[in-house]
């Protein structure tokens, strides 16, 4: 799905987590920064339309330089807290990546590097109220349309929702 599914899941989970209190804006995969308003793969805005958080999502192998580049973008946008989320099947040098994030954190730019599975577990655990598969499916489709996701990605979401009887 050319790296589209992970950002869609993250955007949908963030939307559910914030319950409308913040605006979650996913960007077309591999095009973050294409506009002066885009910082990460997913940007989060408060009700005053101020950027308050940004998330980089990697669903392919990455290096400490990728993490450093993301944190540098976040710093330039004056975002002090951010997330770098990686997919289930990616490879990276854990020590180097976490050390890089820690060093930049000491300079005031905090970026949590976390797996998609841990991110989803953490967010779902901290939400008050039930989240239904139906809500998640509708959000995935809504965000897929927003980023002009490939037809295969949209079909996969629809297939999964059919399998769950939605």
Where do the model's predicted regions map?
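Catalytic core segments in nucleotide and nucleic-acid processing enzymes
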Residues: 4, 8, 12-166
């Amino acid at each position: 799905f050319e790296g589209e599914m992970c950002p869609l899941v993250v955007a949908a989970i963030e939307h559910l987590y914030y319950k409308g209190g913040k605006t979650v804006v996913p960007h077309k995969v591999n095009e973050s920064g294409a506009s002066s308003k885009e910082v990460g793969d997913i940007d989060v805005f408060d009700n005053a339309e101020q950027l308050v958080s940004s998330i980089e999502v990697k669903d392919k192998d990455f290096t400490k330089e990728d993490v450093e580049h993301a944190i540098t973008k976040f710093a330039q946008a004056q975002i002090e807290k951010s997330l770098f989320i990686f997919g289930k099947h990616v490879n990276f040098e854990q020590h180097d990546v976490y050390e890089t994030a820690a060093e930049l954190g000491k300079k005031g730019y905090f970026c949590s590097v976390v797996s998609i599975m841990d991110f989803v577990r953490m967010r779902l655990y901290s939400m008050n109220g039930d989240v239904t598969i139906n809500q998640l499916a509708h959000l995935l489709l809504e965000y897929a349309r927003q980023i002009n996701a490939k037809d295969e990605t949209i079909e996969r979401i629809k297939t999964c929702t059919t399998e769950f009887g939605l």
